[in-house]
From Swiss-Prot:
CDD domains in the record: DnaE_OBF, PHP_PolIIIA
Enzyme class: transferase
Catalytic activity of the protein: DNA(n) + a 2'-deoxyribonucleoside 5'-triphosphate = DNA(n+1) + diphosphate
Biological role stated in the UniProt entry: DNA polymerase involved in damage-induced mutagenesis and translesion synthesis (TLS). It is not the major replicative DNA polymerase.
Species name: Corynebacterium efficiens (strain DSM 44549 / YS-314 / AJ 12310 / JCM 11189 / NBRC 100395)
Subcellular location: Cytoplasm
Protein name: Error-prone DNA polymerase
Origin organism lineage: Bacteria, Bacillati, Actinomycetota, Actinomycetes, Mycobacteriales
Record-stated family: Belongs to the DNA polymerase type-C family. DnaE2 subfamily.
Length: 1073
């Protein structure tokens, strides 16, 4: 009805309801009506002479006539209780969006608070610095007495809050929990450096708050959430204010930057409550949440709240500070008497030089010594000797503990790292540029990644905690964000759809409805929870909590900072990357197996890198299980590249990467390699830098070398050019470097005009996709080592890979099938012969008990320890196994060695499991009935279900007669017996489904039969037509065109068919007789 007033509860402090038209405008975000004057009994001091707190900066716009105030004409206001998406499963907008919106609204400052953390602090600070918005930092603390919002007064307040949160998280003993002390102890830690916001929920404890924190540090928080209960809360808080004299502020407590995001905020809150939106309705805001409002909007909605608005600015002026914390330094190294860190590092390098270079030519040794002198000078000038000593200590710990490790990445460009034993790529003969790793012109510490065998990485991590202390060392976080499937699942869950339907959508069996798609799109990319970085650790000379809180990680014994690697770098925390690498673990197992069974000691770093047999094998794309070159794309490239030297492997590692593929380097290089295209250079000066890659740029270091050779750049200048050309290009820096490059070309070689333009444009284009040669060098060593074992010791190679699972591109079933194709006899799982893991006795492959699903490591260990066994009751009693254990072993065929069939073994399991230690043996025996044996297919199906593998045959072997009748061609004939361009039918077990971003929508299917692997290309159109079959089938018959002219085989599919396994293997059914 026209003119009717609707009691929204938005009556401010007058008790008079606002008209619905104004409420509608406020809720929609429209500015309605003329701003009403804000009445003050006296001019608030904060609007004229702000009083900065410790470490604070003046709040922009807090004075009358400031630029922001003039621009917007708004009432000065600061939102002091905002929540971003880094308050996991609560806020809907990221810190940057919150900052941008606050700036647009004319707010003079903003406070972002996370629950029991400072997760978004760095991103908040960086976003605010870009727009000149003052920042207030704080957190919501889950105290025993209730949730309390704390704002920091300057840097010291921040440091104290970080320590409080750290103590609460670490004392709780597990991830996701906090255990704060009682309120008086909390206040004691703040020591007057915090402002606490008390809402109506603190009304009965307000005197206790004042007693603990002091009257000047307690502020009443009046809600402005446009809820009916707001008015009642205002009345209560005004009464408390009258009695106590406390200051008050107004806050919308926003969980989103704008109204557009509040539905997402509501959905996330429902998920946090483990409910859907309907179930959580009583706990959620009717709109889903609240959003940032301007001072003017709040003044219109709450016309007599002027004192509350003014107080927000006053408090911000005493709390805001710029986030330029002084980060802790690295621990000082305990050097022997008479040594500094630098002299001790020099001593270590000199003492280990001969070990690394004794066998090198004299000319290389002299160049290496000169390079090392240069590198040590740079390290000393930049003040990083302690960094290298810490890394060296970690590597020496690994060596002493016989843990395989090696440094990789840009550290491989350093001769110092090579001599110390940190890296294994020799940079002098490889021509690697040290400045790619470290230079006088670069800010920040070097970055050394250490790959450690994955099964023993935890030992190294715990060594760091022990050596440097839990307070001074922690892992770097990884913010886990929603990806497509996770977003779809949680969106559907929030909207109340049943789990079975959600599972079908996730599998792609059907399309989700529009509301799910829309909400999932909003969730995608949003932070969900805090995880652990793959290997980053920060190590400091004082508590990390001075800068960022730490908390327990999910994994036992791990603690983690609340920031990711980028946040840590921005705050000046030095990160060390300790990365787990499955291939190093597999190689260690291979070495141990060869030593144990053959009595041969293999020293990886002494292997001959020119073994012709290894390269012959790789030229055939016989690379299943070989590090980095076993993927579909790599195996398709190997026959075209035809690697014959170690550097060819370096190229192979770098070639099949998204960058070179998108940059168009792959095919030109391969054509030049095969002689189909002449090797040319845009200018003769490029031959030095591009000669080893046939005139095609592949490596980042080549950009630097071109700048050095063609334009006379120093190494440091060349690295600055490389970084400037990276993903975050600065137009200003690019312009300056372009001018320097052109001048250098002219001065050094007289290159001008079109040739200069061509060189510059090629470098700019290449910079976006170049791969570090140092990285390729490090990985190429592991390519060779793993290929060497595959060629010389295939049984030990496969056993090592199985022991290191999960890792690599292929499943254990595919690895075992590949070993079988290489002549290795596969021995089944046996309680009397198998160990916990795979073994390689006498050149055979014995499968391990760890493959048995549902058995568990402890039970497997007991079985192996007490073997052999004479019967199932004997096994049950001595290995202390239950019914489920014996049933799992029976299905896996591990009891076949006792002379009982699998069905009989399953029958005996329940009875035998009553034989426990301390009981008389044999009294529980019951005769099993006569049970039929299993067919070959039933045995295979049972083995796959129980272990995921088959020891005696690949599944397609049982179907070969049927496949031959259909004209299906085996994998091993596609290269030798089928002409390029022939239409064929193939069939196999689906091993992979891939859709690389570089493939223009083409999906690649991996198929395997008993003779080998096949690569199938499915066009977007065919995929769409047969989507359900393509996505869900475990076996397929595929019709398509063979492509094998280059020596690598692909099949371009034009039809997918289900493989009728059940029909072919059925014994017939008895229907309705």
């Amino acid at each position: 009805m026209v003119g009717m007033e609707w009691d929204t509860g938005a009556r401010g402090l007058t008790g008079r309801p606002l008209p619905w038209s104004m409420v509608e405008g406020i809720l929609s975000g429209r500015e309605v009506g003329t701003p009403r004057p804000v009445l003050h009994e006296a001019e608030p001091e904060c609007l004229s002479t702000p009083r900065p707190g410790p470490g604070s900066t003046e709040v922009p716009g807090e004075r009358r006539g400031s630029r922001q105030g003039e621009r917007s004409g708004e009432i000065p206001f600061v939102e002091l209780h905002a929540t971003s998406s880094y308050n996991f499963l609560a806020g809907a907008s990221d810190p940057g969006e919150m900052v941008d919106r606050a700036h647009e609204l004319g707010l003079s400052a903003l406070a972002l608070v996370d629950r029991d953390g400072l997760y978004g602090a760095v991103r908040f600070a960086e976003a605010a610095a870009e727009v000149g918005l003052a920042t207030v930092f704080g957190a919501e603390l889950s105290l025993r007495e209730g949730v309390l919002t704390v704002l920091c007064r300057g840097v010291e307040g921040y440091r104290r809050l970080s320590h409080l949160i750290t103590g609460a998280a670490m004392s709780a003993g597990e991830k996701g929990s906090v255990d704060y002390p009682l309120l008086p102890q909390v206040a004691e830690q703040g020591a007057g450096h915090w402002v606490v916001l008390a809402g109506v929920e603190w009304q009965k404890k307000i005197d206790h708050l004042i007693e603990c924190f002091g009257r000047d540090n307690v502020v009443l928080e009046f809600p402005a959430r446009m809820l009916p209960e707001d008015t009642d809360h205002h009345d209560i808080l005004r009464s408390i204010q009258t009695r106590t004299g406390l200051r008050g502020i107004l806050s919308t407590m926003p969980t989103a930057a704008t109204r557009d995001h509040v539905r997402l905020a509501g959905a996330k809150c429902a998920l946090a409550l483990r409910a859907n939106l309907a179930e959580a309705e009583s706990s959620l805001h009717p709109m889903g949440g609240t959003w940032l409002r301007s001072g003017g909007a709040l003044a219109r909605a709450y016309p007599q709240c002027g004192d509350l608005l003014a107080t927000t600015v006053e408090i911000a002026s005493g709390c805001a500070f710029t986030f330029d914390l002084v980060a802790p330094e690295l621990p000082r190294w305990d050097t022997p008497d008479g040594h500094t860190e630098m002299t001790w590092l020099t001593h270590l390098v000199e003492s280990r030089f001969d070990r690394r270079y004794r066998s090198r030519p004299a000319e290389v040794r002299e160049r290496a010594r000169a390079q090392i002198r240069h590198e040590l000078g740079v390290i000393e000038q930049l003040g990083f000797p302690g960094y290298f000593l810490i890394v060296d200590d970690l590597v020496q710990f690994c060596h002493n503990a016989t843990i395989l490790c090696q440094g990789r990445g840009s550290a491989a460009n350093s001769a110092v790292c090579f001599v110390l034993g940190i890296t294994n790529a020799e940079p002098i003969t490889a021509g690697l540029l040290f400045e790619r790793f470290l230079s006088r012109d670069r800010d920040g510490p070097p970055d050394i990644d250490i790959d450690i065998e994955s099964g023993r990485r935890e030992e190294v991590i715990q060594y760091v905690y022990t050596r440097y202390g839990r307070d001074n060392a922690a892992q770097v976080a990884n913010v886990i964000t929603y990806r497509t499937k996770g977003a779809l699942r949680d969106a559907a869950r929030a909207l109340g759809y049943p789990q079975g339907t959600v599972d079908a959508w996730s599998r792609g069996a059907s399309e989700p409805p529009a509301d799910v798609v829309e909400l999932a799109g909003q969730l995608k990319g949003q932070p969900r929870h805090l995880g652990i970085h793959s290997g980053g650790m920060v190590i400091c000379d004082r508590p990390i909590a001075d800068v960022v809180p730490t908390e327990w990680a999910r994994m036992e014994g791990r603690s983690v900072v609340q920031w990711d690697k980028d946040d840590c770098a921005a705050a000046g925390l030095v990160k060390f990357d300790l990365l787990g690498l499955g291939m190093l673990e597999a190689l260690h197992h291979m070495m141990d197996l060869v030593a144990h069974h053959r009595g041969i000691t293999v020293n990886l770093w002494e292997l001959d890198l020119a073994d012709a047999g290894v390269y012959d094998m790789l030229c055939r794309a016989d690379a299943v299980g070989v590090f980095q070159v076993e993927s579909r794309a790599q195996m398709s490239t190997l026959p075209r590249l035809k690697p014959r030297t170690f550097f060819d492997l370096v190229v192979e590692v770098a070639l099949i990467r998204p960058g070179p593929i998108q940059g168009g380097s792959v095919h030109p290089y391969l054509r030049r390699r095969s002689g189909e295209e002449a090797v040319t250079y845009d200018h003769p000066v490029l031959e030095k830098s591009l000669g080893k890659t046939l005139g095609i740029p592949l490596f980042q270091e080549q950009i630097m070398q071109i700048a050095v050779d063609a334009a006379g750049f120093t190494g440091g200048e060349a690295d600055a050019l490389r970084r400037a050309m990276g993903s975050k290009r600065s137009p200003t820096r690019m312009a300056a470097l372009r001018s320097r490059f052109y001048q250098g070309l002219a001065d050094t070689h007289g290159i001008i005009g079109d040739t200069a333009d061509k060189l510059w444009n090629k470098m700019v284009a290449f910079a976006a996709y170049g791969f570090p040669e140092s990285h390729s060098q490090s990985f190429a060593t592991l390519v060779y080592f793993s290929a060497w074992f595959k060629h010389h010791y295939p049984a030990e190679f496969c056993a090592g890979l199985l022991r290191a699972q999960p890792m690599g591109f292929y499943s254990p079933q595919s690895l075992i099938a590949d070993a079988r194709r290489h002549g290795v006899e596969i021995l089944p799982i046996s309680i009397n012969e198998s160990g916990v893991q795979a073994d390689a006795p006498d050149g055979h492959l014995r499968l391990g008990l760890d493959l048995v699903k549902g058995l568990g490591e402890e039970a497997a260990r007991r079985i192996a320890e007490h073997a052999p066994y004479t019967s199932i009751p004997d096994l049950s009693r001595r290995a202390d196994l239950g019914v489920a254990h014996i049933e799992a072993l029976a299905r896996a065929g591990a009891l076949d060695c006792l002379g009982v069939g699998r069905r009989e073994a399953l029958w005996q399991a329940g009875i035998a499991a009553t034989e426990r230690p301390g009981m008389l043996p044999g009294i529980s025996a019951i005769e099993a009935p006569a049970l039929p044996g299993m067919s070959a297919f039933e045995l295979m199906a049972t083995s796959i279900a129980a272990t995921g593998v088959t020891h005696d045959a690949q599944p397609m072997a049982l179907l070969r007669a049927h496949l031959d009748a259909l004209g299906v061609v085996p994998a091993d004939r596609l290269l030798t017996d089928v002409a390029d361009g022939t239409r064929v039918r193939i069939a196999g077990v689906v091993t992979h489904r891939q859709r690389p971003q570089t493939a223009s929508g083409v999906t690649f299917l991996g198929l395997e039969d008993e003779t080998g692997l096949m690569n199938v290309m499915v066009s977007p159109g065919l995929w769409d037509r047969q989507r359900v079959l393509a996505r869900t089938a475990k076996t397929l018959i595929i019709r398509g065109i063979v492509q094998n002219a280059t020596g690598a085989v692909n099949v371009v599919a034009d039809k997918l068919e289900p493989l009728p396994v059940g029909e072919w293997l059925s014994r017939g059914s008895r229907d309705f007789r």
